[in-house]
Amino acid sequence: MMKFKKCLLPVAMLASFTLAGCQSNADDHAADVYQTDQLNTKQETKTVNIISILPAKVAVDNSQNKRNAQAFGALIGAVAGGVIGHNVGSGSNSGTTAGAVGGGAVGAAAGSMVNDKTLVEGVSLTYKEGTKVYTSTQVGKECQFTTGLAVVITTTYNETRIQPNTKCPEKS
């Protein structure tokens, strides 16, 4: 029984840390992040006047992280289950196999608890363009924006990429 406890604790800790890390940070959705096919291309640019900055939450796709967590959970669960089954089953192949199968199933089930969507920090920017007022919600931090002039870059129809017009304080 002591071997069982010694094996289970590190495996459980590793699995929980790994599954907790399966959350998208959505940095690739920020206004100042571009794909390689958008580089060195002409993009329409305008200046606008930001008049309001409000916090927002943006739901982003997290399904790839969920699939990764399920696969990793199944792998870790199978290994841990095999070791536990081997120890509990007095070294028998059937105990090892049963433990690996059961552990793999439990690990995959644990990985499926990762959400398909995750909420990330965003901003809702209200801005004036000419005489009209618009709102654009995008991934970013409030500290990246300030009221006043900002640049909007359009890479596709009806897209607004309001560029950060200030920097967040550096963490020390």
From Swiss-Prot:
This is Uncharacterized lipoprotein YfgH. Disulfide bonds: none annotated. One of its GO terms (cellular component) is plasma membrane. A lipid is attached at C22 (N-palmitoyl cysteine). A lipid is attached at C22 (S-diacylglycerol cysteine). It is a lipid-anchor. Keywords: Cell membrane, Lipoprotein, Membrane, Palmitate, Signal. The keyword Lipoprotein applies. It comes from the Bacteria. It comes from Escherichia coli (strain K12). The keyword ATP-binding does not apply. InterPro entries: Bact_OM_lipoprot/Surf_antigen (IPR051407), Gly_zipper_2TM_dom (IPR008816). Pfam families: Rick_17kDa_Anti. The lineage of its organism: Bacteria, Pseudomonadati, Pseudomonadota, Gammaproteobacteria, Enterobacterales. Residues 1-21 form the signal peptide. It is found in: Cell membrane. Transmembrane segments: none annotated.
